[in-house]
Regions:
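Short, charge-rich amphipathic alpha-helical segments embedded
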Residues: 29-51
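Structural marker of alpha-solenoid helical repeat scaffolds
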Residues: 34, 68, 85, 101-102
Length: 132
């Protein structure tokens, strides 16, 4: 019996939620073999990569998901958050501006903007000095 892409995606999500990461990855990749730009499979595989500290692997997956469906706010959030985690601050700011232009929820973007600010703040030298 042939399964539809949606059925395979649901199986992947179920495996992912159950912590069966290898099975989830296999299922997401099986979708991407026949539908390389599938937004949910790319996004979910990116989320999986982030969960095992493979941020660099997640970035192109999130970007592909976003290019395939720029209306999904979660795709914007995931991509910007991954850029911040990867210390790509300039790129994160650029994508954040694009998200605002697309009408992504301001509260969500404000949270990411705070994360960006925290990453770019210079440490206070007084706090770095050893106590006398």
């Amino acid at each position: 019996m042939e399964f539809t892409t949606d059925q395979i995606l649901e199986e992947g999500i179920t495996a992912h939620e159950a912590g069966q990461l290898h099975e989830a990855e296999r299922l997401y990749r099986s979708i991407l073999k026949s539908h390389p730009a599938h937004p949910e499979a790319n996004h979910n595989l990116g989320v999986l990569a982030i969960s095992i500290n493979k941020v660099k692997s997640a970035l192109p997956l999130f970007k592909t998901a976003l290019e395939a469906n720029s209306k999904n706010e979660q795709f914007w959030w995931s991509y910007i958050d991954a850029l911040i985690q990867d210390q790509q601050i300039g790129k994160a700011r650029q994508v954040l501006k694009q998200a605002r232009k697309q009408g992504v929820d301001a509260d969500s973007l404000n949270t990411l903007e705070r994360q960006l600010s925290e990453k770019t703040q210079k440490p206070d030298p007084a706090k770095l000095s050893p106590p006398e």
